[in-house]
Amino acid sequence: MSSGANITYASRKRRKPVQKTVKPIPAEGIKSNPSKRHRDRLNTELDRLASLLPFPQDVINKLDKLSVLRLSVSYLRAKSFFDVALKSTPADRNGGQDQCRAQIRDWQDLQEGEFLLQALNGFVLVVTADALVFYASSTIQDYLGFQQSDVIHQSVYELIHTEDRAEFQRQLHWALNPDSAQGVDEAHGPPQAAVYYTPDQLPPENASFMERCFRCRLRCLLDNSSGFLAMNFQGRLKYLHGQNKKGKDGALLPPQLALFAIATPLQPPSILEIRTKNFIFRTKHKLDFTPIGCDAKGQLILGYTEVELCTRGSGYQFIHAADMLHCAESHIRMIKTGESGMTVFRLLAKHSRWRWVQSNARLIYRNGRPDYIIVTQRPLTDEEGREHLQKRSTSLPFMFATGEAVLYEISSPFSPIMDPLPIRTKSNTSRKDWAPQSTPSKDSFHPSSLMSALIQQDESIYLCPPSSPAPLDSHFLMGSVSKCGSWQDSFAAAGSEAALKHEQIGHAQDVNLALSGGPSELFPDNKNNDLYNIMRNLGIDFEDIRSMQNEEFFRTDSTAAGEVDFKDIDITDEILTYMQDSLNNSTLMNSACQQQPVTQHLSCMLQERLQLEQQQQLQQPPPQALEPQQQLCQMVCPQQDLGPKHTQINGTFASWNPTPPVSFNCPQQELKHYQLFSSLQGTAQEFPYKPEVDSVPYTQNFAPCNQPLLPEHSKSVQLDFPGRDFEPSLHPTTSNLDFVSCLQVPENQSHGINSQSAMVSPQAYYAGAMSMYQCQPGPQRTPVDQTQYSSEIPGSQAFLSKVQSRGIFNETYSSDLSSIGHAAQTTGHLHHLAEARPLPDITPGGFL
């Protein structure tokens, strides 16, 4: 601290000067010099007194004579205060056993106090009424950068910003009203307290208005922007006992008030700062960055002793080669401006370990000239260091790791060492890379140059065990991709699954071909490779690695171990269950073709047209002549579930070719939209639960009322129904069509057949195997196809009785419909087989 007129803020204390070398004793004897003997005795006593101070040895070695005296007085005053404040009982002082127990308890309290200081987000400060720092905890260094020995028994105003000194003086007064005559002299430091109060004039110590909470800015050596740190002071005024001060008349003064407070930063620290605040260390360097000192924390983090650190020469020997030019740039900036700014680089610790540090260097002046450099460094994690390395600016036309060729106009012979990556393998730095003829000698460079520091570094500090080879990693990545793709295989058909499997096998063969170059390609220079030696000791060959990379090997091994392969998981039932719970529609699919999606737009158009035609039908009711026809249809189809939706066919019916064509005189009936695909809404009917297969759009062409009943198709067999009774045929007829398979339903279900009379524009629906849905009754609807009922037709009665009895149509029928108005030219037989078979040769169009 300085009290000069031009210096108003605190600075670092001057240190003990370096002792001169002891001159040899002359042969003629020692001359008597009383003044020198007096100085020697004084220095001896000061050294003995300094050794008694409660400070680390590295701090004591740097104290000058005045600092030793100042700290000794401060320690004695603090001891006197605690002797009074923590006065023990006479029994404890007289009893030896109790005294031993008290010493153990005091030692435990001391250890607990150190832990409390480390956990506290701030430091403890005690300031007397005359603005002297009575005590400051050692943690003040973590926040302000000052040593504890630098601020004790010094004026507190030298630490406070000039604009906040008046407020701090007001807070020191018990009534917040200090004497105006005792102003703060900004040039010459703090005032001397001339007014002392007696206990009668002061309020009780436990009064509420003795509490203090205020803010002010303190001088901070760690701040890079303003040099001050805003802190919050929270505490109270308490009596400072045991000081034994005397007045001008020699009378003993009563204890005076002092501020006991905890100073905490206004901005709370981050988690990273909390973790690393106890590891900040400082080093001292010459102007050429040669280290000349290190504190105790630095020795603990780096592992060097102060002697090992100071006898190595240039400080650039401890810096990573890829960071040398980056640090040199900050070094030049510090020489020009006095401060380097925050610099992140890798520092070499003991046992060839690299530590990322964030440092800030300051230039210290003495007598107006630069004297030495103080560097404050904070350790970083490897992740933080890599982030700073990526953000590092590369404004120069070369990287910091390979810039020597530009600076020295020579080709760099140190390409393996100058790799900017911190991790290198031994295989990449063989002896053949270090040509003896290209390696310059140490004497060819200046001792203080970067190249000289680089040559003095050991090559082993840049070496580490090799990592796993890249081909194995790429194969594992491909294996994970194939496993993810196996989920899609469960939805594909058998043919596409085989093709995908063949493609995956092809990929595995490509990987094996890529790795078939031999061990030399996988592991270059494998004789010097640690991984190769370990594999040889374990009895593992490169052929074993190739077999492990084979996909079939992994699959066989996992199957033998009882593991479940993703491709063996069948989720079809789960998907069907989800669709059954979510939708009320059915899905009819054809087993011979692939599924074709139906868009939602088609569903909307069909629903709108259905609503329009329903309104037209309500406006035009059917005539009375159709009532028997409707009754017959209702009797034939007792449940709507057994309507045309249940009589779909795997294939097509044969074309009916009646002669002459008959036209039914009936009005156009309501157009029914049979939305048989699951994505179409509008039907509430469900069907018997059948296995799902692929489906195909099935188109049914309907004829108008004034046209023949069915169009002609040359590829189909004509089936004509005579107008007589339905009688079983004794002899099956031959046909080009093998069979016409109807939808198979359980035996307890009945079949409803509706003869279609009035047919309208063609409609598209899906024919095939039924969806696996449970049959539920739906809303009653008027059938599309209605046949006029006539009591004169005995065959109709027999057919109706069979339908109502819910029998199974497994036999062959021949029908005679001459009463309807046409004669049969060819008798057709309708076979209802037990199983449905696909008809690939028949066109997807037919009539029922």
UniProtKB/Swiss-Prot annotation:
Q: Where is this motif: Nuclear localization signal 1?
A: 12-15
Instruction: Provide the Gene Ontology terms for cellular component.
Output: cytoplasm; nuclear aryl hydrocarbon receptor complex; nucleus
Name recorded for this polypeptide: Aryl hydrocarbon receptor
Record-level Gene Ontology MF annotations: E-box binding; nuclear receptor activity; protein heterodimerization activity; protein homodimerization activity; sequence-specific double-stranded DNA binding
Q: Which Pfam families does the entry mention?
A: HLH (PF00010), PAS (PF00989), PAS_3 (PF08447)
Q: Where is this region: DNA-binding?
A: 37-65
Q: Which lineage? A: Eukaryota, Metazoa, Chordata, Craniata, Vertebrata
User: Key word Cytoplasm present in the record?
Assistant: yes
Gene name, per UniProt, is: Ahr
Biased composition of type Polar residues is found at 436-449
Species for this entry: Mus musculus castaneus
The PTM entry states:
Mono-ADP-ribosylated, leading to inhibit transcription activator activity of AHR.
